[in-house]
Amino acid sequence: MKDLLKFLKQQSKTEEFNGIKIGLASPDLIRSWSFGEVKKPETINYRTFKPEREGLFCARIFGPVKDYECLCGKYKRLKHRGVICEKCGVEVTQTKVRRERMGHIELASPVAHIWFLKSLPSRIGLMLDMTLRDIERVLYFESFVVIEPGMTSLERGQMLTEETYLDALEEYGDEFEAKMGAEAVLELLRAIDLEKEIEQMREELPSINSETRRKKVTKRLKLMEAFHTSGNKPEWMILKVLPVLPPDLRPLVPLDGGRFATSDLNDLYRRVINRNNRLKRLLDLAAPDIIVRNEKRMLQESVDALLDNGRRGRAITGSNKRPLKSLADMIKGKQGRFRQNLLGKRVDYSGRSVITVGPTLRLHQCGLPKKMALELFKPFIYGKLEGRGLATTIKAAKKMVEREVAEVWDVLDEVIREHPVMLNRAPTLHRLGIQAFEPVLIEGKAIQLHPLVCAAYNADFDGDQMAVHVPLTLEAQLEARALMMSTNNILSPANGEPVITPSQDVVLGLYYTSRERINGRGEGMYFMSVAEVEKAYATGAAELHARVKVRITETIIDENGERSEQRRIVDTTVGRALLSQILPAGLSFDLVNQNMGKKQISKLLNTCYRQLGLKDTVIFADQLMYTGFRYATISGASVGIDDMVIPAEKYTLVADAEAEVLEIQEQFQSGLVTAGERYNKVIDIWASANEKVSKAMMENLSTETVINRDGVEEKQASFNSIYMMADSGARGSAAQIRQLAGMRGLMAKPDGSIIETPIVANFREGLNVLQYFISTHGARKGLADTALKTANSGYLTRRLVDVAQDLVVIEDDCGTHEGLTMKPLIEGGDVVEPLRERVLGRVVAVDVFYPGTEDVLAPRNTLLDEAWCDKLEEHSIDEVIVRSVITCDTDFGVCAACYGRDLARGHIINHGEAIGVVAAQSIGEPGTQLTMRTFHIGGAASRASAENNVQVKNSGSLKLHNAKYVTNTDGKLVIVSRSSELAIIDELGREKERYKVPYGTVLEKLEEASVEAGDIIANWDPHTHPIITEVAGSIKFVDMIDGVTMTRQTDELTGLSSIVILDVGQRGSAGKEMRPMIRLVGADGSDLMIPGTEVPAQYFLPGSAIVNLDDNAQIAVGDALARIPQESSKTRDITGGLPRVADLFEARKPKEPAILAEISGTISFGKETKGKRRLVITPADGGEQYEEMIPKWRNLNVFEGEKVERGEVIADGPEAAHDILRLRGIHNVANYIVNEVQDVYRLQGVKINDKHIEVIIRQMLRKCVITAAGDSEFLEGEQVEVSRVKIANRELVEQGKVPATFERELLGITKASLATESFISAASFQETTRVLTEAAVGGKSDNLRGLKENVIVGRLIPAGTGYAYHKTRNDARAKKDEPVVVNKITASEAEQNLADLLNLAGSQD
C-alpha cells in the first residue's frame, strides 16, 4: 500500500514543471548528486566482464549490472529490492539506475572550467578584469599572480614572471602572497565582493567619457549583476570536484573477438583520473615544485579535453587519429543531443515504400499494400482476433497472423476502415508534406497516391518513396482526420490558392475537351439538353469539338442560399456541354464555356471553393480528374518529329542578322565603335533575331487556316500536340518550343557572360559539335547550382523556423489603431500587384471612407473578403490602412485581428495557430525554385539603365509626388527635388502608373493636366546632372580663375567653349582653399535670395562640373547653370534569388549603402580632408548640427544650401534596412523588406502572401535598445525584448514613475534566434556552448513559452490542439499563486481519499 502511494506521488512530481533553470554547480551540489567517488581509472575486468570496484563502471557507486541482482550474486530477485549487499556493497535494484546515478572525482588541485575561460568573452577574465592571455598564463603555470599584496607596493591581480617573483620575494619576504595555477584564480574570484563592486561601478558609470571604457564597464556590470541576482558564486567557475557521467550514458560494449567498443568519454575520464591520482601521490611525497606544477598543468589540460576537446590547443586524439568526442561535442551540432535526439526522433508504427499513381482513388484515399497494412496494424488485429474469440491468447493471434489465415484479412479490413494513416514525403518543406488519408488495401508492394496531391508533396512517380505513419490513439486519429486529411487541405497556406489543381495529363484532357474545331462533324446542331448531347456524342453523330447550340439548366444560389433553376440556350461545343455535367450546381456554365487551360481550371476550383464550400470542391476536383484522364486518353496527343514545324522565314532572318553582325564588325575594325559597344550590339542583334524567329514559329504553330461551311477562310487555333501542351499549361513553354523548332539562341559562359555567337540550329535540325559543346556549359552549371541551392534553401528555412517558432495567435484583438498603409504596387507603367490582392483577408485598421466624402465605406475591424474587395474596387479606393502583425500590441504572441484570414482555411485565424512556423515554411519552401546567381549587368540589360524620358501607357491625368518644381521661360515645369515621383491617375482617381523622375527633369505637361496614352511627358539627360537655378538674374563667378580652379575647353565639332571646374586634387596649392561658385545678382548688383528663404542664391560647383555660360550672363528661372557629368554608374552586380532573400532577412549592410540624412535641415559642406568631404546639416529650429564624412568618389544628390528631410537619400546606393528603421520608422522598413523579398519571388512566379514576410519582420524587430532607463531596472544601452519593456513601462506608469524609453532594433534572423529569451531554443539552434555558458552564468530560467522548448522537454506544444492544454495549465497556475486555506482532515477521511485515488488509478490503466 505504502509503495503504491509512493509510486503515485512520484508520477505526479515528474510531470508538472513550469520552467527549467540553468546555473553553476557548487562543489557541494556536485557531491550531493554523487553516489560515490571514482578513484581508479579501471573500467571492467575484461575476463569476467564485471565492473572493477571504485572504477569508472563500479556497481557499488552506480548500481547493479543486472536487474535486482547484486554483483556477487548473494541477493537475487525482487523480494530483496532495496537491500544493500554486505559483501559487494551493491544495492539491489533495477539496472536503469546506472543511467541516472552520477559519481564524482575529488580533484587534488582546483581546475578552471574551460567554458567560462575560453568562450568569448571570457567570463573569468571579465570578472577579474584581466585579459584572457594573462589568466591563461597563470592557469597553465607560466607566471605568478599577486593574491594578497599586504603592505607592499604590489597590486592585487598583478602578474609576476618567475624572475620578478623571486626579486619580490627577496625584497618583501613573506609580506605578500602570489600563486600560480587555478588555486590563484580561485582565490582572486573568492575575494570579489559583488555588492560592493556593483555599487562602485554604478556610481562611476555616468562619469565615464570614453566609449570603449564605458562599454567594458557596462559589460562587467551586467556580468556581476547576473551573478548577484542568480545566486551563483564566481568561484564556482573553478572546479574542485568533477562530476562523473552515469556509466550507461558512456557505455563499454564487448565486441566478439575480445575487443571492446567504448565511448570516447571513458578515455577522457581515465586520463583525468590517472593524472589526478598521480598528482595526489606527488603531493603526499612532497615532490619538487616543478614536477607538481607540471602535473597540475596536465590535470588542467585533461579536464579541458573532457569538457570541450579542441577548445584549447590541439585536440586529444584516440588510437585512430580522430579527435575524441568530449561532453561539449555530445550536445552541439547536427549529431548532438539537441538536434539528433530531442528535436528529431524516430517513430514506431511506420513503413516506407515506392509510390505509384492511383488514378481511380478518391481524394481522401491512398492505396496501402496488404503486406504493409498487416504489419502496421498488428496490435489492432491481435486485439480484434482475441475479442472475436478467434484466438485465445495473444500468442495464438500472432501465429494466426504469421500463417495469414483467411480470417486475418477480414479482420484487417475492419480494423483499417476509417482509420486514417499519414503519408509523408521527404523533404518535408511545408506542412502539406504530411497529410492523412484513408487506406484502401491493394495487392502489390507500392503505395498508391492520388494524383492531385502530388503538387503539395512535390512528388512524381519516377521512383520517389514515401513513409506511412499510423496514428494510434483516438485523439491522434481525430486530429489526423479533422486537421490533416487531404480533403481539408485544399488551399495552400502560403498564398490561399488551391493547391490541388490538376496538372499535366488532366489539364491536357480538359483542354482538349473544351477546344472548338471549325467544320467539326455535327456542327450547327441544336440540342434540347445536355443528355441529348451525350447521346449524339456516344453514337458518333457529333464529335467532341463541334460547335453546337445547347439548352442548359443552371442552378442559381442567391444571398440567402435559396436555389432557383434557369434555362438558356448557349453557343458552345459538345465537349464543353459534357463538362457541364460534372459542374456542381450553383456555378455558372460560363466558367467552362472557354478553353480550359491550367489557369482557368485553377480559377474554376477557387471560385467553387469560395462559393460552394469544401465538400463540393473536393467532389468536383475528383470528377475533373477522372474526366481529364479519360479525354486525354481519347485525344491521343503525342509528340512526333513532324509536330515541330520550322518556319520558312527562319533562314532569311538568320542571314539578315549575320549580315548586320558583319557590318558592325567592319565598323569596329575601322575604329568607329569600341569593343564593348560592338559586343553589346552583336548580342542585341542576335537577341532580336531570336525573338523574330520564335514569333514566326509560334504563329506558324498556333494557327491554321480553314474554309468554314460558308466557304470563307477562317483562322483557328491549331491542334498541333506540342502547341496544345504548351498552350494548356500541361507541359513545356514557348521558350522550350522555340528551342525545338526555332533556334536555340544565345548561350552563357559559366561566369555568366553571354557568348556572342548564338546557336542558330534547333533540336529538330540537330546541333553540330561546336554548338553542342557551347550548350554543355549551361547544363552543367544548372546541375551544380541545384545541388548548392538545396542546401542553402534548407538552411534558410531552418533559420526562419527558428526565429519565428514561438509566434502563436493568443487573443482575439489587441485593440491597436496602428497598421500598415497598403497601396497597389506600381512599377513604371504596370500594376504589379493590385490593391485587392494586397488587402484580401486583412482587417481594416482605420475606417475607409467613400472617396471625397466623410461616409464610412468599410468600418474599422472589417475582415476584407472577396465581396468587400469588389466593393473597394467599385469605389476605386486607392489606399487602405490594414492591421498587421508588425504593429500588433499583444505580448508574447499576436492577435487574430492583426493577422486576419487563415489562408489555408478562408476564415479568420483560430487561437493557437502557429503562424510563425507557417510563415517560415511558406517562405522557405519555394526557396529551391529561386536562382542562386548574381546577375552581371551586360548586353541587353544595360540599355534600360540609361532611360531619358517617360512615355505613358494609359490615358489619365498627371500627378506629382513629393516634388518641388519651377516653371521655366517656355512655361514647362522643371523638377528641382530629389526622389520625386510622377503618377498617372485615371478618371476614377485610381493610380495606373508611377515613375521616378530625377532632378532636372523637364515636364511637357503641367500638374493635373490630362495626358494621352503614348505621350512622352518628361525628358531628362541621363548622362549629366544639372544644377538648376530657382531665380532669374545675372551670374557672377566667384573663385573661378582660369588655370587655377578651372580650365576652358573647346568642343571640336561645335566650336563652342565651355568651362570645366578642376577637382581639388588637380589644383595647385593656390586653388586648394578656393571654392568656385556662381552667385546670382539683381540689376543693382545685390545678392538675390532663394524664394521663400533668407538664403542667398549661391551655387557651389563641385569638381569636373561643366559651365556653358560666361560671367555676367543673364539667366532665367529653370535654366541649367552647370552640368555635372555622371560617371556611367559602375555596373553594380545585382544579387538575385536566394542569396538576396537571405541578405534581407539577415539584415546585412550592403557594400556602399545609400547615405541618408540623419536630421532635417539645410545642407552645407565643411572643410575637406584627405579623400573625404565633410557634410553638415543644420536644422531649421537651431538644434545641434550633424556632421558626416563622406568619401569623395560618392556621387552626392544634394548641393550646398539645399533643404533635406530626415531619411532622404543624400548619396545613391542600395539602402540599408537599419538606416531605414532608424530614420523613417518601422512602417517604412517593413514595406521595404516586404517589397524587396516579394520582388525576388515574383521574378520566379512564386506567390507568397505579404503576411508571412511581415511575421518574420516582427520577429526581427522584437528587440530594442534602452535609450533612457527612467525608474526601470534596465541599463542604458541594454538590449531587451520589446514586450518586456512594454510590460515594465505599464507597471511604472501605474505607479506614477518614469517609464524607460527605447529605440527598436532590427536584428538579422540568426542574431534574433540566438537572442531569444529561451536559452533552450537558442542552444539548439547554433553556438550551443556560448548560449549555455551565458545562460548558466546568469542563472537564467526558461519559461518554456515557445514551441521548440516544449518539443525538447517532451511536452505538448503551446499551439494547435496543445494550446488548450497549456492555457488551462497557465490559468490553474495563476489561481494557485493566490493564497490557499488548508483544511485539516481526519485519518479516516484521508483513507477514504486514498481509496478513491486508487480506484481512479485502476480505472485509468
From Swiss-Prot:
Annotated binding of Zn(2+) 2, by residue: C814, C888, C895, C898
Protein name: DNA-directed RNA polymerase subunit beta'
GO molecular function terms attached to this record: DNA binding; DNA-directed RNA polymerase activity; magnesium ion binding; zinc ion binding
Gene Ontology biological process terms from the UniProt entry: DNA-templated transcription
Species this protein is from: Shewanella oneidensis (strain ATCC 700550 / JCM 31522 / CIP 106686 / LMG 19005 / NCIMB 14063 / MR-1)
Enzyme class: transferase
Residue numbers binding Mg(2+): D460, D462, D464
Keywords for the protein's UniProt record, in alphabetical order: DNA-directed RNA polymerase, Magnesium, Metal-binding, Nucleotidyltransferase, Transcription, Transferase, Zinc
Function as written in the Swiss-Prot or TrEMBL entry: DNA-dependent RNA polymerase catalyzes the transcription of DNA into RNA using the four ribonucleoside triphosphates as substrates.
Cofactors: Mg(2+); Zn(2+)
GO cellular component: a single term: DNA-directed RNA polymerase complex
Binding positions (Zn(2+) 1): C70, C72, C85, C88
Cofactor note: Binds 1 Mg(2+) ion per subunit. Binds 2 Zn(2+) ions per subunit.
Family, as annotated: Belongs to the RNA polymerase beta' chain family.
Keyword match Nucleotidyltransferase: yes
CDD domains: RNAP_beta'_C, RNAP_beta'_N
